[in-house]
Amino acid sequence: MNKPIIALDFQTYQEVEAFLAQFSGESLSVKVGMELFYSNGPAIVEKIKQQNHAIFLDLKLHDIPNTVKSAMIGLAKLGVDMVNVHASGGKKMMEAAREGLEIGSTSGKRPKLIAVTQLTSTSETDMQKEQLVKASLLESVLHYSDLTKQAGLDGVVCSALEADEIKLQNGSDFLRVTPGIRLASDATDDQIRVVTPEKARSIGSSNIVVGRSITRANDPVAAYNQVLKEWNA
């Protein structure tokens, strides 16, 4: 999934179908999140797969290890390319998630598994006040990244602002999947740690997730091509 990942932040398959139709059969990397998956169920994944798109299923599992393991066995059977959990669920939970994917994968190759460190909507002040974390935001992200690697996962979800430090700590093969990407002309909305595609590339992101800059654009194809151009600059 080296192409920019488009966040399909829609509620219905009809909206998804109309959006994807604009790309004239091009094979894309897309993210199916909670809104779309919970509104339509697993069938939405199969419909998108039939169009030859790579899928990041973004459900951010966070529960006791046995529950997450069982859930991942089921998700693995969907044939998606990448899934995620919350790193704050702990090392045992993340290990259980990986084991579930390995059991459930029918192709012999499990989906990539990454863990959310801190949401890009979270500021350092929010984290320290609401989560009672005394460390800095960067220290928290690096701690979760190290825990994720110890659990045998493939990488993390992080903001681009922490990506280079994670790369130095955990190696270049450890994925740094970055949401909160906007074209320079777009509003940041509810996300705080936000950068442009070109900036994300220059400071260490391995993959980027782009939603509103593409899906809400007057010309989504042109916006996607601009993101792609900046990402590959």
From Swiss-Prot:
Xref: InterPro entries: Aldolase_TIM (IPR013785), OMPdecase (IPR014732), OMPdecase_AS (IPR018089), OMPdecase_bac (IPR047596), OMPdeCOase_dom (IPR001754), RibuloseP-bd_barrel (IPR011060)
Sample GO molecular function, one term: orotidine-5'-phosphate decarboxylase activity
Coiled-coil stretches: none
Binding site for substrate: 9, 31, 58-67, 120, 182, 191, 211-212
Biological process per Gene Ontology, one example term: 'de novo' UMP biosynthetic process
SMART domains linked: OMPdecase (SM00934)
Enzyme class: lyase
Family: Belongs to the OMP decarboxylase family. Type 1 subfamily.
List of catalytic residues: K60
Role summary: Catalyzes the decarboxylation of orotidine 5'-monophosphate (OMP) to uridine 5'-monophosphate (UMP).
Record field: catalytic activity: orotidine 5'-phosphate + H(+) = UMP + CO2
Key words, A-Z: Decarboxylase, Lyase, Pyrimidine biosynthesis
PROSITE patterns found in the cross-reference section: OMPDECASE
EC code(s) of this entry: 4.1.1.23
Gene Ontology CC terms: cytosol
Assembly notes: Homodimer.
Name of the gene: pyrF
UniProt keyword Lyase, yes or no: yes
Name assigned to this protein: Orotidine 5'-phosphate decarboxylase
Pathway it works in: Pyrimidine metabolism; UMP biosynthesis via de novo pathway; UMP from orotate: step 2/2
